[in-house]
Amino acid sequence: MDEPTQSGAGADTRRWWHGTVGYQVYIRSFADSNGDGIGDLIGIHDRLDYLADLGVDFVWVTPFYPSPMADWGYDVADYCNVDPRFGTLDDFDTLVTAARQRGLRILVDLVPNHSSDAHPWFRDALTGPDSDHRDYYIWAAPGPDGGPPNNWVGYFGGPAWTLDEASGQYYMHLFLPEQPDLNWRNPAVVEEFDRILRFWLDRGVGGFRIDVAGALVKDDLLRSNPQIGPWDPTADRYEQWLAFDHLHDVFQPESHDVFRRWRAICDEYDAYLLGETYHQDPQGLADLVPGDGMHGGFWFAPMHIDWEVDKLRRVLAGPIDLVGERLLWAAGSHDVPRSPTRFGGGDLGRERTLVLNVLFSCLPGVPVLYQGEELGLVDGRVPEEAVLDPVDNGRDGCRTPMPWAPGSGNGFTSGEAWLRSEQRADNETAHAQVGEPDSWHSRYAGLLAALGTLPDLVYEPLVWTDGGYGPVIAYRRG
């Protein structure tokens, strides 16, 4: 048997989020309170007892800001308000207060890499090169051939540049053209977001999940990325992205200056600052969440692997020495097929997902459940004619409405859901599972209850061991 090996980066001073479990709410699909088919803040409020009884500690809510919804809310037109489809600021304040009364904290999704093209800043920027907000965004003259300024491609495919015909300049967008990237080398943008953070912190939020955290600052010279493979503009968006070594459009070290600044602000409020740190390399993740920056970052590799023990162990062990308690673990999200679907479907996929969440819960860091994971949900079935995702049809299945009860609408809405999908089976609903000893919900609730009785899982180092036989992942804490 191999000698045990100890693992885990040095611990931060203990904060409220150590030893907690998070829960992601995709607001459009969680609970609709008014029958318009769209989940809303009051709907979340009305389900707080469910979340508290499940045993989670904080709730990350996806964007609810005013938005044209080109990318379902990740195109923000006003960072300090609530879209009427989701409610009002008063509804938000009520949600935060009610959550605190139940021992829950609300984390909001902050989208700082880009705004909507409908944001007043960008509207003003379009009025001309001398406008007050022109430098809030990234503009450049055409390249020598009259086309885009460089070879950057967007994550959703195609060039990362769109021509503003009125001025003859291009603006940069890492995602959709409706999502122009903000210029984080402009101190005015930095100051705007200081105010935005304080606006929500003063309303009592428990912290922020930073969208696209690794991409804020771009190369100041706008240099082209090295091309490492053939680029075909008609290819799959991932193939287009992987044709380049992204040295200049993402992961610039100056982003850390922003995160250190936000860390100081959040520390004033004892708020949790975590990032969507999309990096497949453990060292790359560690570089995104150094000890003096964001309090934590998601490790996404488990969302992109098959169920194979050696590979799974490597993925789990890889970042622990480097990142330790700053890790956030998740089996699913609103951007990937649900893990039971990925891991074989049916009860096999559900069992594997539960095992993965048990592993996450026993490792350094913070596990986060995606809504419905506790019910063992596989991807919902969306008829071809009802597909809505403008970017990737594979995301609709994980975004179908939460099934609260049997029958039409599955208790999500009294109207027609924004995303049409097949009705869930009765035994997939929360109504059928809560309180049933052998249900998936009861298994997850039991896991979370057990975590509260095992302080070694928070305070003791991790020791990897040889399982002694077969394909086994083995370790101990304490």
Segments the model singles out, each with a brief description of its role:
Residues 2-198, 202, 215-280, 402:
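Acidic/aromatic-lined carbohydrate-recognition and catalytic surfaces
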Residues 3, 16-18, 221, 226-248, ...:
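Loop/helix patches that line or flank the sugar-binding groove of alpha-linked glycan CAZymes
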Residues 59, 208-210:
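Hydrophobic residues within beta-strands of alpha/beta enzymes
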Residues 67-68, 114-116, 159-160, 209, ...:
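Flexible loop/turn segments at secondary-structure boundaries
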Residues 107-108, 209, 274, 330, ...:
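Generic enzyme active-site microenvironment
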Residues 116-126, 267, 272-307, 377-389:
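Substrate-binding cleft/loops of secretory-pathway carbohydrate-active enzymes
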Residues 236, 309-326:
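Glycoside hydrolase catalytic-domain groove-lining segments
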